[in-house]
Amino acid sequence: MGSMVSAAEQCGIHPYTEGVLTIARHKRNPISSWNPRRVQSYYAQSQSDSRLVNGRKLWKELDGMNNLNIEVFNWFWSNKLFFPLEWCERKNGKPVFVFFWGTILLTGDGKPCVVCMWRENNELRRGYRLLDSMFDANSPAAQYTF
């Protein structure tokens, strides 16, 4: 448990607690029928070449795309076997945190954040990162292609 938890903490991931977070902006997913083959992890242009990008800038770049929201996040959490394993394969020895940009939440002290999932010791974990944090090439967006 140790090294992955440390990596999550180093990446600015906070534990996900349902009662503490409130919805600031929620974009509905216009998915009429679910097809797991259409779910993908997406890296924004600003994340190429392992660059760090501020979460607010990344959010603007991803806005208008088919980003999965907290409803899908909660569905994956309840149905962990359906969460794509390949999304969590380590890149450059670092864990991959998959973010659900379709919903922006607020922490208890009003800071905007986005929820994420990752694998730790073959177990799915969840958390969130503040938008004022930096995101890298190990921080893809969960999206649906039509």
Language model: regions and residue ranges:
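A binding-site-centric feature that preferentially detects glycan-recognition modules on secreted/surface proteins
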Residues: 1-66, 72-146
